[in-house]
A protein has these predicted regions:
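N-terminal Rossmann-fold NAD(P) dinucleotide-binding loop
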Residues: 13-14
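C-terminal amphipathic/interface module of NAD(P)-dependent oxidoreductases
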Residues: 50-51, 246-286
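Conserved Rossmann-fold NAD(P)-dependent oxidoreductase catalytic core, especially the SDR/UDP-sugar
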Residues: 81-120
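Catalytic helix-loop patch of NAD(P)-dependent Rossmann-fold dehydrogenases
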Residues: 105-145
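Glycine/proline-rich active-site loop of Rossmann-fold NAD(P)-dependent oxidoreductases
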Residues: 126, 139-141, 151-164, 192-202, ...
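A conserved pocket-lining segment of Rossmann-fold NAD(P)-dependent short-chain dehydrogenase/reductase
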Residues: 161-180, 184, 188
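Mid/C-terminal beta-alpha module of Rossmann-like enzyme folds, strongest
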Residues: 195-243
Length: 286
């Protein structure tokens, strides 16, 4: 069977749904975003409102859950466990985040690393992951947890920020983070749905942890632009929002060896290949 329902059609939904449709899947999904509904219906996605998630589940033999957790864990499992049990669903993919690892002061983390969440969202993500894993074990449903690094793609990227003058170069010594291109997310999830054999936890992250400054320097270089002077993190941290400060206070290098073993090489192994591709597409449009 090739019926997949995506609960929570968010920012990566067009890329993901396009890839699934091209692979011959019947794609269903839930969102109340009208503009997104219109776009996705045009490529063949059957879209349900959030009030009809139960109907969306019953169409599927595979589920992808992107809905963020609440204070009690996974909202979908808490609310719709009966519908999932009564459906033909035999595999669930859950999109989590590498933020569950917390701060490792620049050290490397892998799927077996101890989780050190401090903020409520990260703590709730850990609860949600465990909800899914326990549910899968209890009802013999394969569950695969994908911990995503920072997502970028043709719409959300530093090149667009540079063009729209919304970028502020910040430097913090020894600070690393990983990212993942939305096309790589779509490719991996397509393979996971097609195989329907994997379970457990996997980091969905690129090969090269890097500082924000390294990424910006490369972006300005390929655009042949001069980068403005950077600001030291210590000089601006007190002015940051709590969300932005959280990003800078968490520091880790994510190992993606398991990802490559299970799903092969990435389309965009590092930010360099990804930004080159994005900038080329911008040039083609201009």
């Amino acid at each position: 069977m090739k019926n997949i329902s995506i609960l929570g059609l968010g920012n990566i939904s067009f890329e993901l749904c396009s890839a699934l449709v091209q692979q011959g899947f019947n794609v269903f999904g839930s969102t109340d975003n009208y503009d997104r509904q219109v776009i996705l219906k045009k490529i063949g996605v059957k879209v349900f409102s959030r009030s009809n998630i139960d109907q969306c589940i019953l169409k599927a033999d595979k589920l992808i859950i992107t809905v963020p957790p609440d204070n009690f864990g996974c909202k979908i499992i808490k609310t719709y466990s009966k519908e999932i049990i009564d459906s033909n669903v035999r595999w669930i993919g859950y999109l989590s985040s590498t933020s569950v690892y917390g701060n490792y002061n620049g050290e490397e983390v892998n799927e077996n690393s101890k989780l050190r969440p401090k903020e409520s969202l990260e703590i709730n993500r850990v609860k949600a992951e465990q909800d899914l894993l326990d549910f899968g074990t209890k009802y013999s449903i394969l569950v695969e947890i994908f911990r995503l690094s920072g997502i970028y793609g043709n719409n959300k990227n530093v090149i667009n920020q540079i063009i729209t003058k919304k970028v502020k170069p910040i430097y913090k010594e020894g600070h690393y983070f990983n990212r993942i291109h939305e096309k790589d997310i779509a490719r991996v999830l397509c393979l996971a749905c097609a195989n329907q054999m994997n379970s457990g936890i996997i980091n969905l992250s690129d090969n090269l942890p890097a500082s924000q400054l390294d990424v910006l320097i490369y972006a300005y270089t390929i655009m042949n632009k001069s980068m403005p002077k950077y600001i030291n993190y210590s000089d601006i941290s007190n002015e940051m929002s709590s969300n932005l400060r959280r990003f800078w206070e968490n520091n880790r290098r994510v190992n993606n060896s398991l990802l490559k073993t299970k799903y092969g090489n990435l389309l965009f192994p590092t930010y360099k290949e990804g930004l080159k591709s994005i900038y080329h597409s911008y040039e083609m449009q201009s």
